[in-house]
């Protein structure tokens, strides 16, 4: 194990974060895995150590809590770990009518999706700048490009991630730090989301991907310096449609989508109003 640098991944214990961790380990990257306290993080750590010749540091941290980002940065600094890749993956999603969502849900969603990503990027930036090449991958969403009922706050937080990443990339364009934003569509990251995704219409089902299929595209795009990474042919097709369709037609489509969302979906009880960790 000659590599002495580390890739830090937040929301790493399950779903997309777990897939990211395994993909990075398969590329001989040492890992700092950050996730909520629980057995999943330790299971993943042991799995990677058994199967890959990389070093793995597991840090339990609830990034919704005040001072948690500073505590994480301090812990990494105390361990004298050199981070050359930061993947801000942790986030909270939800599918709920805005008026039915709790204040606590929206507060946590904004803290984790927006504030934690911003603060961790700021805290680790000087560390990243010490390397010959460093990378920041912020996990956004296709939701940042569309007006989605029941996902108003989630979509808004991902719009922030999109514009924050693009602006920071421009600011750091002459430095050694490369910034990319990943904008996936729906992903089958847990059982409830898998069931709900299968209950969608034909086009929405075509756009859904498994985390294991997204992560190679994400890491390849990051290492190749791609600014915006949109995995999947169908998702790229949707982006093309969004550019060429008149607003009037998009409003009609959104209205039809609202009617479908207003119908009772047997799987939304697993998703709302409680938050779903997007990892």
Model-predicted regions and their roles:
Residues 11-14:
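Conserved glycine-rich cofactor-binding loop
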Residues 27-44:
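Conserved glycine-rich Rossmann-like NAD(P)H-binding loop of the short-chain dehydrogenase/reductase
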Residues 121, 157:
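Active-site helix of classical SDR
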Residues 181, 202-239:
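C-terminal helical subdomain
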Residues 141:
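Residue(s) in the substrate-gating loop at a strand-loop-helix junction
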Residues 97-110:
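Substrate-binding pocket helix/loop in short-chain dehydrogenase/reductase
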Residues 89-94:
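Conserved NAD(P)H cofactor-binding loop of Rossmann-fold oxidoreductase domains
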